């Protein structure tokens, strides 16, 4: 396995570890989730370039669309929680009533 793939997998694992360690704060969890999505995007882009298959180029773009939707929903939840409670703790998500 080339060194670039090893670095991308290592970046994903570090982001996953950060997600597990800092799971009590929403902002830290969102940043770790974005790091995971970035490493998945880089891995899928490299795989699509190595496959030389024209339809494989759609996968990284679709992944970016899902990452943007995830970021928008996460930031909306963060703003809602911080305006209501003044903190960004995850346990405040259970207290939101729509």
Curated annotation (Swiss-Prot):
The keyword Transport applies. Gene3D superfamilies: 1.10.287.3510. InterPro entries: NADH_UbQ_OxRdtase_chain4L/K, NUOK/Mnh_C1-like. It is found in: Mitochondrion inner membrane. The keyword NAD applies. It is a multi-pass membrane protein. One of its GO terms (biological process) is ATP synthesis coupled electron transport. The chain crosses the membrane at residues 1-21, 29-49, 58-78. One of its GO terms (molecular function) is NADH dehydrogenase (ubiquinone) activity. Its EC number is 7.1.1.2. Coiled coil: none annotated. Core subunit of respiratory chain NADH dehydrogenase (Complex I) which is composed of 45 different subunits. Core subunit of the mitochondrial membrane respiratory chain NADH dehydrogenase (Complex I) which catalyzes electron transfer from NADH through the respiratory chain, using ubiquinone as an electron acceptor. Part of the enzyme membrane arm which is embedded in the lipid bilayer and involved in proton translocation. Belongs to the complex I subunit 4L family. PANTHER family: NADH-UBIQUINONE OXIDOREDUCTASE CHAIN 4L, NADH-UBIQUINONE OXIDOREDUCTASE SUBUNIT ND4L. This is NADH-ubiquinone oxidoreductase chain 4L. The lineage of its organism: Eukaryota, Metazoa, Chordata, Craniata, Vertebrata. The gene is MT-ND4L.
